[in-house]
Structure formats: structure tokens, C-alpha cells
Amino acid sequence: MKILKKWFLGILSFILLFLLATFIFHRISLEKEEASLSPMGQQVLVNGHQINIYVEGDGPETIVVLSGAGIASPILDFKNVSESLSKRYKVVIVERAGYGYSDDSNHSRDVMEVLSETHQALSQANITGPFIILSHSMASLESLAWREKFPDEVKALIGLDWALPSSYEDLKDNQALLTLAYWSSKIGLLRYFPESFYIKNQTLIESERKQYKLLAYKQLMSQAMLHESQTVKENAKKVPSNINPKIPALLMVSNGDGTSFSQFEWQRYAERFASDQSNVQVVYMDAPHDLYHYQSDAIISRIKEFLENN
């Protein structure tokens, strides 16, 4: 029994020392890495923190891109999409608080608060509507809230595998896992994970991958990311579950891989959402949740066709 106790205490001591050493190394590295970060875009002050806005292209119509949850660098994550669309449109990527080159924030992540910050950031950057909102996954909630609060600003909605409000009713709430992910990130355990864990855009060049990696170490999982994940089910109850008939919408829906739902369940949410809305077009794609990394050309083609016809 004494041997087992000593063995247990030895293992526990090793784990604690390992975590402490990792944390110290992580904090020192973050300070050094700050000098290597090369912000893309411009920063504006909103609610006491800097929000980063990236603009590409100068077309007559403006597409605002909103990323899904847990994306360390929305600018680099959507690089293929923004580059392609910027040849014809003005593409604006707004990095929410706690994402990319934006500051972290402990402000409320209520969906209306997040929308307000996005709206203020665009205004301060002198970017005016009407906007075509292109959003992924959880950003569906902000998109739907935008449609309700500022209807005259929304020309069209494009959903990249939207996590629709009804899906959050069935989403299993795992606060313990979120807390574990948060503290694992703060300690610096992400540094032991392979790049493929957090860099999904495999077309990035080496310098871009380095930037993405540094942003991942800094921002995953930020306070803002944690808080928005903790409040997402409540936020889903605050947005409308339909779209103004005057606003055309295109929903591109994945096969459910990468969500916690089966293909039938995931696509059924979109089917029900669009069932009585003639202005909502649904396209089903045989690709995972981050479908813009798997069928980029097809998605760009669909978006251009949709916008040309609307």
C-alpha cells in the first residue's frame, strides 16, 4: 500500500511540475511571440477593446464575413473565399473580440451585444451598407439578429452550414468540457497539439501558417470564446427563426460531419427552416462542417450565381 501511495504521489508530482513548466514556458513564449504577430487590416476601438477589420477588394457590393466559433484567425481561415470573392466584391472580415488580431474581452457575449460591436466596428471603419452577410455555423445567430435589428442594411444572407436556432435546442450542454478546454489553453497545452488540430486551411503558405499558429496559441480558448459558447443556447432563443421575405437567402448545408448530429438530423434542421420560406434556397453538399475548406470552388460558384440572380 505504501509503495502504491508513493507511486501515486510521484506521478501526481510529475504531472503538476509538467503543467507548471508548460504554463511558465507558455507565458514567456506569448510575450516573445507578440512581436512576431503582423496584424492584417485595421483596428478600431469598440467597448474598450480593439476590433480588427480586414478589407479586400473594392467592388460595388459589400460582403461581410462572420466566422463560426473557435476560429483563431478568421482572416486566414477564410483566405480562399475572400480572395476569390474580392475580384468582384468588397469583402470585409470582422474578427469578433477574442478572435484573430482583435483584443479579448470579458464583456457579455449576448448575441445583441456581439452584433452591436460588429456594427460599431464597421461604422468606425467607415464601411456602410447595404451588406451581404456571409457567415458560418454559430454566426447564423448574429446574422439573424442583424436581419431583425437592421433590416434595411441586409441585402442578402449566405449561410455556410449554419447552426440554426432549432439545433441548439437539441445540442448537449457540456460546461465541464468547455471549462477544461479553457484552462488547457491558458496553461499552454495547445502547443503540444499538431497544427492540423487548429489550422484547417491547408492552402496557406508557411508564413501564414506561422501567423495562424501564433494566433491559436494566443486566442484559443479566449475569454470571449468561452463566454459565447456558454451563452449560445440562450442566444439561440433570442433570434428569429425565419428571414424577412424581402431578403434572399442561400444556405449551403454539410453532411453533418464535424457537428454532433447525424447527416439526417443536421440537414433536417435546414429543411424545416426553409420549408415555408420561398426566399430561402438550400443546397446540400457532401462535405464536413467546415465545407469551405473542402469544396471551395463549388461554394464560390454557388455564391456568385446566387448574387447575380438576386
Locate the predicted segments by residue:
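Conserved HGGG/HGGXW glycine-rich cap/lid loop of the alpha/beta-hydrolase fold
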Residues: N52-Y101
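Conserved serine/cysteine hydrolase catalytic core
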Residues: I205-D276
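Flexible "cap/lid" loop of the alpha/beta hydrolase fold
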Residues: I158-K186
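Gly/Ala-rich beta-loop-alpha elbow adjacent to hydrolase catalytic centers
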Residues: S135-A139, S143
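Active-site loop/oxyanion-hole signature of alpha/beta-hydrolase fold enzymes
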Residues: I93-I132
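Short beta-strand immediately N-terminal to the catalytic nucleophile in serine-hydrolase-like folds
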Residues: I133-S135, L160
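Catalytic active-site module of serine/aspartate enzymes centered on a nucleophile-bearing elbow/loop
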Residues: Q277-N310
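Alpha/beta-hydrolase fold catalytic core
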Residues: K2-I63, K87-Y89, E308-N310
